[in-house]
Design a protein with these regions (language model features):
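C-terminal alpha-helical interaction module
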Residues: 1-333
């Protein structure tokens, strides 16, 4: 891992997130998504066609993780191919560093940014993950990070595998939407990690731990966020909690408590981690490497040498939790 002068790391961080850093408020603004067409058969919509699209994800990113887990749970990886960017961001953006020759085998590009520019030659923002490319053109056509999982659930339903879980039951959709919005807004360590003022940091810090307390109480009497079965709300929460356990506590300074200090949240996280589709796409070591070693993130720790911490000890993630007792149907998730 190469040495980075502190000013170099800070400059990379500032440049990467320049479109979101609000110098007036000291906060990080929500991302603006340029490629926001919906899937469907209407005019101007993206046709729902097997083997036409490629999901691009990066294992360190929580929003990427949501999309990948949802794709896997629903069996859509049979009809939508997957490309994976490396966890160490280049100054120009995400790169396909783990592929042979550093080139995505389908899109034939090294930088994800090239697919964004194919989608819009005037694009000047930050190329983000997850993103969906049309393999017939090589262009990014959809990058709404928060909504891609829901599109997979609703718009791609006819291609779900047999006995796929219902992650968005109609009778619970309002509740799921409200809880998912709460999770994305409040269980948001980035509000602290990317704060540019003490006031912004403190506001995010208080909000973060108040929200964790609320969910700790909720999970005392139910196995999953919405009851007996995993829904989209759980996917939103899980990817945030597992990163709190691995990195956020250290890297973003949300250190009032550890995840283990919340018995219900800790057991809940382990319960979900042990579920097929979650375990296999939660790449613990890559998540840790992303937040601690990616050049654009190293400023958060003053980690000029790109060193990697040894902890945490993740063996407990595989121990039994007993949370199935909270479910009316303990044998099914």
């Amino acid at each position: 891992m190469s040495y980075l002068e502190p000013f170099q790391s800070v400059a990379l961080f500032e440049n990467t997130f320049r479109h979101q850093l609000n110098k007036k408020t000291g906060k990080i603004d929500e991302r603006k998504f340029v490629f926001d067409k919906h899937f469907g058969d209407g005019e101007g919509q993206l046709p729902v066609v097997p083997d036409r699209y490629r999901l691009i994800w990066m294992p360190g990113c929580p929003h990427s993780n949501k999309a990948m887990i949802t794709l896997r749970l629903l069996g859509l990886d049979r009809v939508i191919s997957v490309g994976e960017c490396g966890v160490l961001r280049d100054p120009r953006g995400w790169i396909f560093s783990e592929d042979l020759g550093g080139v995505d085998p389908v899109l034939k590009i090294h930088y994800l940014d090239d697919a964004y520019l194919k989608g819009d030659p005037d694009f000047v923002g930050r190329s983000t993950v997850p993103a969906i490319a049309d393999v017939t053109t090589g262009a990014i056509v959809q990058n709404e990070a928060w909504d891609i999982p829901k599109y997979f659930v609703v718009d791609w339903k006819k291609y779900h595998k047999e006995n796929a879980p219902d992650l968005y039951p109609k009778k619970l959709r309002t509740e799921i939407d409200e809880l998912s919005a709460f999770i994305n807004k409040r269980i948001n360590a980035y509000a602290c990690g990317f704060a540019r003022s003490q006031e912004a940091f403190d506001e995010g810090y208080v909000s973060y731990f108040e929200a964790l307390g609320t969910l700790e109480e909720r999970l005392a009497t139910r196995r999953f966020i919405n009851g007996d079965y995993i829904t989209l709300s759980d996917i939103h929460l899980y990817v945030a909690l597992i990163r709190f356990h691995i990195n956020y506590h250290l890297v973003f300074g949300v250190n009032k408590k550890r995840l283990e200090d919340y018995p219900n949240l800790w057991n809940y996280t382990r319960d979900i981690y042990q579920t097929e589709g979650f375990y296999d796409y939660t790449k613990l070591e890559l998540i840790k490497r992303h937040y601690q070693q990616s050049p654009h993130m190293r400023a958060k720790l003053g980690n000029v040498y790109g060193l990697l911490g040894a902890g945490p000890d993740n063996r407990q993630l595989l121990s039994t939790t007993g949370r199935e007792k909270l479910s009316a149907d303990p044998e099914n998730k």
